[in-house]
Amino acid sequence: MSGILTRWRQLGRRYFWPHLLLGMVAASFGLPALSNAAEPNTPAKATASNHDQSVKVNFSQLALLEASNRRPNFTVDYWHQHAIRTVIRHLSFAMAPQTLPVVEESSPLQAHHIALLNTLSAMLTQEGTPPTIVRRVARAHFTPQASFSVPAWISQAQGIRAGPQRLS
């Protein structure tokens, strides 16, 4: 009897909980966060008509769609973040190389795994902040030269001096 319970616990630890967390994280991406004030249930017909209205978008309104706030009630959910961090931790342990990679034997797949591990560790260590819209961008002031010269252009473009500065 204890052997069956041990096997069941191992199955849950290895397969059930990581896949359940991965499913929770995958299902929650792209869904709007639920606000504290729940809206009353609407009939199916009204929901379908609202959905159809949101699909009909003119091309002239694309800028308005881009400027609109995609997640107006953005809230940071502690348990959602915990599930994401746990899945990232599971993935990073599962993808970690078992031996130290040798420089001569590195393949593109190993490089891809290392890059993915670096990205996952960066996601774990940096603090998550909601996206913000940048309203004003500082523009660089461009001052054109008074006259065009080939040596000056080559020196600026390629970082070398091509010929004398002045032709006498």
From Swiss-Prot:
GO cellular component, one term: cytosol
Record-linked InterPro entries: SecM (IPR009502)
Keywords on record: Cytoplasm, Periplasm, Signal
Domain of life from the UniProt record: Bacteria
Subcellular localization(s) per the UniProt record: Cytoplasm, Cytosol; Periplasm
Molecular-function annotations in GO: translation regulator activity
Coiled coil: none
Primary localization class, coarse: cytoplasm
Signal peptide location: 1-37
Family: Belongs to the SecM family.
Function: Regulates secA expression by translational coupling of the secM secA operon. Translational pausing at a specific Pro residue 5 residues before the end of the protein may allow disruption of a mRNA repressor helix that normally suppresses secA translation initiation.
Name of the protein in its database record: Secretion monitor
Gene field: secM
